[in-house]
Amino acid sequence: MEQLKILKQSCQNAADISQKRLLSILKDNAGTEYGIEHHFSEIRSISDYKKQIPFSVFDDYKESVDRMMRGEKNVLTAYPISFYAHTSGTIGASKHIPFTERAAEIVRAYRSISEEAYAEYTLGKPPCMPSAPKMLYLATAREGHAPDGTQITNFSGRFIIEHKEELQKIAIEPELIFCDEQMDLPYLFALYALKEKELTGICAPFMAAVSDFFCYIEKHWEDLCQDIEEGVLRPDDRTSSFLLNRLGAELHPDAERARELRKIFQVGLDRPIAAEIWPSLRYVQAIGAGGFSSYTRIVRRFIGDIPIHMSVYAASEGLFGVSVQMNSPEYVMIPESGYYEFIPEEDADLSETFLRTHTLEMDQLQPGKKYELVVTNLSGFYRYRIGDVVTVNGYFGQSPVICFSYRRHQILNIAGEKTHEDMIQYAMDSLKKRVHINIVEWSACADYSTSPARYLLFMETDPEIEPYKKQKIRNLLEEKLSEASEYYAHYRQEEKLGPLKLILLQPQTFALYRDVQIWNGASPNQLKLIHVITNAKTEAFFRGLES
């Protein structure tokens, strides 16, 4: 529990450590092009920094990053670049975010945090982690290179690539993680995982991947058991025969394992089955809070009370927080990973001139309130508005304990009501309690084709809802959304917002949406569902799949 111990110590003086980190960043980067332009050498205090340095977004850096990728040095940062993180492109266009060696060191320091949290969770009592764990990584690590030769990959993929020497701990063929070819990954991940009886952990960047993994097994267990019994790989249009032959050469028939699995599945899948499939399974690790909470509920159906570690609070711009407890959606901010500022939610739309000098420090936050996070990282981004709004739940020493709430620009705002994701999620959760339906996923957008404008709420359920229940469900959603947002209720009463329209979707709509995103180049590791739709193309996709 070495890193947890270090974190606990640093959090006792978190605000001071974070501020000293800022002054160190400014000193180290005073000779860069950005540092000279913004007079880093003249900054002596936090107050000076806030007066001199503007807020920023990625577009402010894009031209500089392009130059860095062509080999120019000392543009945004003097620190050596480790790699460029290719963003998923699920929010706007994809980007290449510089990630320095200094930032990578922070990630490496916390890469065993799940094991440490699990050890603290069990207090050294059984079931402890085996001495030779077998982990399933539901992730891929594909890479490219910038014009100057620097590696381009996704955030999670980079740190898999770095630790190839530990592949003996992985319960699947390394080929599946590192291969650049198209392949039927859901089938291959499920097959290799089911073959490995001694699996100890299931890891993924986001809980959606774990949910998809279990749902695939639920639907295809008969074929999977047959292939395990025969020691063959099932042909598929997405996987080349060459790759199938290469992978298949490592498979061997296992009739005994197939019999064990069939016995489990034939009893029924309406109970937690993970511990029966893998008696040594200790935990699941994935980000499963906020917009991923619905996937966490699905995974719970399969794993029962096996603990979940919510991993880290991170983005392509850096690692900002870690979960220090099992089964908790909270993250402790890491003081040494950058300098953090916080904008109160209610102030987020005030003028930048005012906000620049009125951000709050780590030790000035009120538990229960929401704040927009502003980051100065170790990779050349200064006062960067990453767009996340977080809820502060308390403190761990002096460091804030946060939960992700919503993306600042992912809101519905027709008449000034500013409805964000967690308000609609509240309505969805309340609906499930009232009518006992299984909501696979949902998305929403503003519809200006009527007067007054209204919300469109796209919802997929399993099983599908009978048409005669649709109006009742719509009315309940309207009621619960009004409970969640007094402004929504107010503007509905004043008829500045029209009645919400519920659109029920065909089965597998959201699975198809994820497949389309991957087909268009999004990384499976980073794929995040956008609950609030802000572009016409995505809206048209969902409209076209109305049930």
Q: Where would I find each of the regions flagged by the language model?
A:
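Active-site glycine/GP-rich loop and adjacent strand/helix microenvironment
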Residues: M1-S41, Y49-I53, G71, A141, ...
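Long, hydrophobic, well-ordered secondary-structure blocks that form the structural core
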Residues: P98, A103-Y110, H309, S316
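Conserved nucleotide-state-sensing and coupling region of NTP-binding domains
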Residues: M129-A146
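Short secondary-structure capping/junction motifs at helix and strand boundaries
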Residues: K95-P98, Y118-P133, D223-D227, P307-I308
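Mid-sequence acidic-hydrophobic segments that form the walls
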Residues: T90, I113-Y121, Y216, H220
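Hydrophobic alpha-helical transmembrane segments of membrane proteins
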Residues: Y110, A117, L188-F189
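Conserved adenylation A10 loop of the ANL superfamily
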Residues: Y84-P98, F213, L502
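Active-site diphosphate/adenylate-binding microenvironment
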Residues: K20-Y84, H96-R102, I113-P126, G144-G149
